[in-house]
């Protein structure tokens, strides 16, 4: 096995909401659509390394909970693994509003 990279950081759930406009303070806005995908700095770097065929090990804590379950399933589907498992805590999420 050749040299590789160690990728340390976060794997999070990105919840992307399509909206007509960014809401002003104190106002509401309704989403036209929603999608969910894995994001986070470490995951994004690992995904790019995988596409370029670079050996890497992803150290991104994967917890327990609904966000962690989604992330774990998507990591497996994409061929990524993380040996860091955290009991009693869920992964985070980022709510992204896109005009």
Where are these regions (language model features)?
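Short beta-strand scaffold segments in enzyme catalytic cores
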Residues: 47, 93-97
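Conserved phosphate-binding/catalytic loop of the ribokinase/pfkB sugar-kinase fold
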Residues: 86, 96-99
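Glycine-rich phosphate/adenosyl-contacting loop at the front of the ribokinase-like
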Residues: 1-61, 66-70, 76-77
């Amino acid at each position: 096995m050749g040299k590789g990279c160690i990728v340390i950081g976060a794997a999070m759930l990105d919840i992307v909401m399509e909206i007509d406009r960014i809401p002003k303070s104190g106002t509401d806005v309704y989403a036209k659509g929603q999608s969910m995908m894995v994001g986070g700095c470490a995951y994004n770097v690992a995904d790019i390394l995988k596409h370029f065929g670079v050996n890497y090990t992803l150290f991104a804590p994967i917890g327990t909970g609904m966000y962690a379950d989604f992330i774990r399933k998507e990591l497996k589907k994409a061929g990524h693994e993380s040996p860091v498992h955290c009991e009693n805590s869920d992964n985070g999420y980022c709510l992204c509003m896109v005009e």
